[in-house]
Amino acid sequence: KRIKWEPNVIIYYFLSRQEKWTEISIKDFNKNHINLPRYMIFEDSHYYETAIPLYKKYKFQKLLKPQQKFKLDNYYKKSGINIDYWGYFIDSEKFKMRNLESGFKYDILLYGFINKVAYPLRVKFFEVLQFLNEKSNLRIKHIPHPGYYKGALNKMPKNEELSKVINQSRFTLVSSSSYQILLKKYMEVPMSGSTMIGDIPPDYPELKDKMIEIKNDADHDTIVQTIKKCFENEYIEVEKESRRYGLMLSKTKNFESGYNLLNKITEQIINY
């Protein structure tokens, strides 16, 4: 027997700015349940030039953002967008620490799209690793990113498979992109038991003692010297704190936590 039910809130998720992720295929979306609260989740919310027109076109009442970015958030507010922070939430059954009976398999790992405009620091990381691969005995692991053409992402490790590689790596290089925002890697890596090396997003100073900082404008020599210090064990305390941080994230940034927070956010307007 089919149960008849009526929603009390509409939540629509957009991944990014490409057309395949921004077209709502629900017929008469703006005419259905017009009296219900409408929430919009836009994961790549740094693409405000796409998010703002979508928000207004489909008459959303609130934009749920995955991260804080002071300058960007002010722009949204000045454009009449009502924002709230939901956050990123990671599958802790897949991204987790695993026992390494033989120790770390890799000394340092790099993964993600290599692009000079979008990820200038990651490009420098890649160039430094090429140099170190020739000049040192470090066990370097690079997971090439095939690009974003159709079917390409199926060729690279994801979820549990990716977490296992991270877990096998003592250090993992991360960057906040040219937008200097918090990305999922800043959670995936510590949750999988590796210590991050990279820049700290300006709106997240609390990461300072939980990762090894390399500023976004660092030159190649600075990157090399910082990596050298890592293997001279100058950051042992940071490694310990990173592990504690990863365990904390597995309890506070898992899917159940995300579900509970989303309920809390939506209940505020439903019960208003």
Which residues are covered by each model-predicted region?
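Nucleotide-sugar donor-binding catalytic core of glycosyltransferases
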Residues: K1-P7, Y12-F29, N35-K210, S257, ...
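A short acidic/histidine/glycine-rich donor-binding loop in glycosyltransferase catalytic cores
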Residues: D209-D217
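C-terminal "capping" alpha-helix adjacent to the active site of nucleotide-linked donor transferases
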Residues: A218-I236
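A charged, aromatic-enriched C-terminal amphipathic alpha-helix characteristic of glycosyltransferases
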Residues: E232-I270
